[in-house]
Amino acid sequence: MIKLIVGLGNPGAEYTATRHNAGFWLIDQLAREAGATLRDERRFHGFYAKARLYGEEVHLLEPQTYMNRSGQSVVALAHFFKILPDQILVAHDELDLPPGTVKLKLGGGSGGHNGLKDISAHLSSQQYWRLRIGIGHPRDLIPESARAGAKPDVANFVLKPPRREEQDVIDAAIERALAVMPMVVKGELDRATMQLHRN
């Protein structure tokens, strides 16, 4: 059963619409659906709400520590409420999936994602759930003929807003993720994964 849903992103209005904030977009939607208000909670270093989602009590969190310090926020809340790693779902942007793709998985490495790296370090575990929201990779925007030897600027890419057509399919992917949330919060994660990956 998932007790804590974390969305990753960077704080500040200048980052709101950037690809790296896809996790925040999901949490904002969940909070709206639950009629919950995210409030600045200093002891958790983030915006926090306790929500009633699909009959279950769930903690929603948007760390306000900047991406590479996300673990500080997650571990503060997890320790306070005695939440285990496998009861945590972290929603994050995923370079290795094209826009419009969304996948669930338990555990694994960070894939170069600094937010995940910091969470794993603070929890001393990689055994938490991830909701991977595809944003694509900057190399995909380079014509194939020019890709050899090209060094795409990943840092610049994730800190820019998606193109309009990308935003539309990312929003649709987040809607599909929201559709399986009743199963997720009830602990039916295998079923949620199968349904999400079928789309």
Swiss-Prot record:
Protein name: Peptidyl-tRNA hydrolase
Marked site positions, Discriminates between blocked and unblocked aminoacyl-tRNA: 10
Catalysed reactions, semicolon-separated: an N-acyl-L-alpha-aminoacyl-tRNA + H2O = an N-acyl-L-amino acid + a tRNA + H(+)
Record keywords: Cytoplasm, Hydrolase, RNA-binding, tRNA-binding
Gene name per UniProt: pth
Residues marked Stabilizes the basic form of H active site to accept a proton (site): 93
Function comment: Hydrolyzes ribosome-free peptidyl-tRNAs (with 1 or more amino acids incorporated), which drop off the ribosome during protein synthesis, or as a result of ribosome stalling.
GO BP terms, alphabetized: protein quality control for misfolded or incompletely synthesized proteins; rescue of stalled ribosome
GO MF annotations, alphabetized: peptidyl-tRNA hydrolase activity; tRNA binding
Residue numbers binding tRNA: 15, 66, 68, 114
Assembly description: Monomer.
GO cellular component: a single term: cytoplasm
Xref: InterPro entries: Pept_tRNA_hydro (IPR001328), Pept_tRNA_hydro_CS (IPR018171), Pept_tRNA_hydro_sf (IPR036416)
Domain of life, source organism: Bacteria
Recorded family membership: Belongs to the PTH family.
HAMAP family attached to this UniProt entry: Pept_tRNA_hydro_bact (MF_00083)
